[in-house]
């Protein structure tokens, strides 16, 4: 079966190239890094000069001037990006490289949490983080510490995968959640032990894998350990023939609080002047179809209410502004004005990495992707004690949604009319105590679930 997949991956190469080209044309690929899709990367190893300057590592190189000089001269400056890239050290010095694959934005935040906590225990370890989407790449490039580097995952073909693995030679691979690339996983397991963490299977994928159970088992046998995020997912894995998976809960419960620039927060808070801020976060066009028609009504009822919209894909900003105009709403993007135009109906945040800043000033946050896409990360807003609202489709975050609802830490709505009713109720001064309770419960929920991270680390560190 795997040989058949390998053969198909060659037959389908022209289609892969066309897909990459289309993604490039619509702005979903970075032309400056397109070579990484073919395992041609400027970063050949993740160690940097600080690794060589480390006292412990100076000791390792002591008395071996030739290798020390080679290590130093292998570090070069990439003038186009300003990043430091490096040729591989000898295998004996490249033994502490962890490769983490995070498909998209949510998984990337979990990767950052793992890196932060593993590096505290093992300061000599370095990290390679791969992802597939441009949005996750931008976040990771901005947030990764010096001990880590990001690269796009190459096309799932044996030629590119083997070249990628030869370049990096990781010593442990960690795949987060549900993106299973057969060739990458099969070849990766030949290089090092692989772990699948925070694993989940959507209902749709589960039905598809049931028809290809033997192939699913063939892919999953490459993992030395599989940790799922819920009892429901554990049951699905068991039904698919994976009997040794364990459930430790959702690592997204342990995501670290999003960073906030305190100077910018001070300016923003002062500018908003105690207005009640409602944030619509990680929105898709399907969400905006529901949200935009109710905003005029909401603002007419609550003059001190201000709306901030943060699209999942900021490159859609022009179409969102046009859509606002069609609903007779005025809107300004952050790229046009660094602070909200208070006379406008909506402020659109079209920059990455600023979600924490706007959650900091929000009273209520609606989590996008929850009408048709299965929902996005609820917990990021919970860390900022926001009253959280989400739509009817949380199929990708079922257990988190169930948990917050059971703890009265969030509200689920059915449609636009229901959303307007809930927002009107919560923003009414008569219901301020109930609003306060939802906000407090959201923060308590994430604080009480921090133990999940410790349990994950106990398992992961056994493979270091």
From Swiss-Prot:
InterPro entries: Glycos_transf_N, Glycos_transf_N_sf, Kdotransferase, RPE1
Catalytic residues (positions): 107
Enzyme class: transferase
Domain annotation RPE1 insert: ranges: 47-93
Chief location category: membrane
Site (Transition state stabilizer): 177, 252
E.C. no: 2.4.99.12
Transmembrane segments: 2-22
Protein's cellular compartments: Cell inner membrane
BP GO terms, sorted: lipid A biosynthetic process; lipopolysaccharide core region biosynthetic process
Pfam families, per the entry: Glycos_transf_N
Disulfide bonds: none
Pathway named in the protein's UniProt entry: Bacterial outer membrane biogenesis; LPS core biosynthesis
GO cellular component: plasma membrane
GO molecular function annotation: Kdo transferase activity
Residues involved in CMP binding: 311-312, 352-354, 377-380
Membrane topology recorded in Swiss-Prot or TrEMBL: Single-pass membrane protein
Catalysed reaction equations from the record: lipid IVA (E. coli) + CMP-3-deoxy-beta-D-manno-octulosonate = alpha-Kdo-(2->6)-lipid IVA (E. coli) + CMP + H(+)
Source superkingdom: Bacteria
Sorted UniProt keywords: Cell inner membrane, Cell membrane, Lipopolysaccharide biosynthesis, Membrane, Signal-anchor, Transferase, Transmembrane, Transmembrane helix
Family: Belongs to the glycosyltransferase group 1 family.
Record's function text: Involved in lipopolysaccharide (LPS) biosynthesis. Catalyzes the transfer of 3-deoxy-D-manno-octulosonate (Kdo) residue(s) from CMP-Kdo to lipid IV(A), the tetraacyldisaccharide-1,4'-bisphosphate precursor of lipid A.
PANTHER family: 3-DEOXY-D-MANNO-OCTULOSONIC ACID TRANSFERASE, MITOCHONDRIAL-RELATED, 3-DEOXY-MANNO-OCTULOSONATE CYTIDYLYLTRANSFERASE
Protein's name according to its UniProt entry: 3-deoxy-D-manno-octulosonic acid transferase
Protein species of origin: Rickettsia felis (strain ATCC VR-1525 / URRWXCal2)
């Amino acid at each position: 079966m795997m040989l058949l997949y390998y053969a198909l991956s060659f037959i389908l190469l022209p289609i892969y190239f066309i897909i990459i080209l289309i993604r490039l044309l619509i702005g979903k690929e970075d032309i400056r890094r397109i070579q990484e899709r073919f395992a041609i990367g400027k970063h050949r190893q993740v160690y940097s000069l600080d690794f060589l300057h480390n006292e412990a590592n100076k000791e390792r190189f002591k008395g071996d001037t030739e290798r020390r000089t080679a290590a130093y001269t292998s570090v070069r400056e990439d003038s186009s990006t300003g990043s430091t890239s490096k040729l591989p050290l000898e295998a004996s010095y490249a033994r502490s490289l962890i490769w983490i694959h995070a498909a998209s934005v949510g998984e990337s935040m979990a990767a950052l949490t793992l890196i932060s906590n593993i590096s505290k225990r093992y300061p000599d370890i370095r990290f390679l983080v791969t992802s597939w989407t441009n949005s996750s790449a931008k976040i990771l490039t901005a947030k990764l510490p010096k001990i880590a580097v990001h690269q796009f995952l190459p096309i799932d073909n044996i030629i590119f995968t083997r070249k990628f693995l030869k370049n990096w030679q990781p010593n442990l691979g960690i795949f987060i959640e549900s993106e299973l690339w057969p060739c990458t996983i099969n070849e990766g397991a030949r290089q090092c032990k692989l772990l699948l963490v925070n694993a989940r299977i959507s209902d749709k994928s589960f039905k598809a894998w049931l028809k290809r159970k033997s192939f699913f088992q063939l892919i999953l046998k490459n993992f030395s350990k599989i940790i799922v995020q819920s009892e429901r997912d554990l049951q699905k894995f068991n039904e698919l023939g994976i009997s040794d998976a364990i459930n430790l809960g959702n690592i997204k419960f342990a995501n670290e609080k999003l960073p906030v620039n305190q100077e910018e927060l001070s300016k923003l808070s002062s500018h908003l002047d105690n207005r009640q801020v409602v944030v619509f976060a990680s929105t898709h066009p399907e969400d905006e179809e529901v949200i935009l028609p109710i905003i005029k009504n909401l603002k007419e009822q609550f003059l001190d209410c201000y709306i901030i919209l943060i699209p999942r894909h900021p490159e859609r900003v022009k179409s969102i502004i046009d859509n606002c105009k069609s609903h007779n709403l005025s809107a300004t993007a952050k790229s046009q004005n660094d602070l909200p135009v208070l006379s406008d109906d909506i402020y659109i945040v079209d920059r990455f990495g600023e979600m924490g800043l706007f959650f900091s000033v929000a009273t209520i946050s609606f989590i996008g992707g929850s009408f048709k896409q299965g929902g996005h990360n609820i917990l990021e807003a919970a860390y900022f004690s926001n009253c959280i609202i989400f739509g009817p489709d949380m199929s990708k975050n079922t257990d988190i949604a169930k948990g917050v609802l059971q703890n009265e830490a969030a509200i689920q709505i059915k449609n636009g009319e229901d959303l307007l009713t809930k927002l009107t109720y919560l923003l009414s001064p008569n219901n301020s105590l109930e609003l306060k309770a939802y906000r407090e419960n959201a923060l308590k929920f994430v604080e009480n679930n921090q133990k999940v991270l410790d349990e994950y680390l106990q398992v992961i560190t056994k493979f270091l």
